[in-house]
Amino acid sequence: MPLMFRADEETKTLRFPFDFEFTSVFTLDGHTLHHEVHVKNCGDENMRCGIGFHPGFNIPFDENHTTTDYEIRFEQEESPIILDCLPHGLLSGKSFYQWKNTQAIPLTDTLFDNDSFCLAGLRSKTIGIYEKNSERKIICDISEYPYTLLWSAPTKPMRFICIEPWQSLPAAETDTSEWNEHAAAACIAPNESYSITLHTTFER
């Protein structure tokens, strides 16, 4: 199922000052959902951009489970670097360790009381939501993404969790408003395209 969004005068004035086409294509193959994203530069100058996905998953999986029956699990042990984000979403320039030498992050209803966790430095190719007492899990392939954001609304009990693979980062607090000076995952030449896919597998 393809969905396309085209830049218009409003987006170029208020949001992103480039002429582009953004296409999302969803394909289901067995238990795996493939979400392809294609960005075309329709303008006459180079366009810098970075793609970040924002999938969210309901938990618990059924009414017989609660938040603590689940954990975020990496493919291997990790000591992720947490990139500190300010309340308005910009990077503060600070980083810290929240977990060290762990393969699993237990879910609790207070985990996201202080907002999200932007993970960097991961070696794992996958990260997922695992139900501890069953084979049910949701696994995201993050092998093409250097950053992964974990986030949920601070509601109790937790009703969903987002696993967001990113190819680039938000702007830093000290960045200027000039788009071409921001860090980006891709620089697309005029009439060229950039594509990336997120693979998510649902198992039970």
What is each model feature region?
Residues 37, 187-203:
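Short Pro-Gly-centered flexible turn/kink motifs
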Residues 37-43, 152:
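Asparagine-centered strand-capping/turn motif at beta-strand->loop junctions
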Residues 1-30:
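Extended, loop-rich substrate-binding clefts of extracytoplasmic carbohydrate-active enzymes
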Residues 17-21, 28-34, 44-46, 65, ...:
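Coil-to-beta-strand transition motifs
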Residues 43-44, 204:
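Short, acidic/polar linear motifs in exposed loop/turn regions
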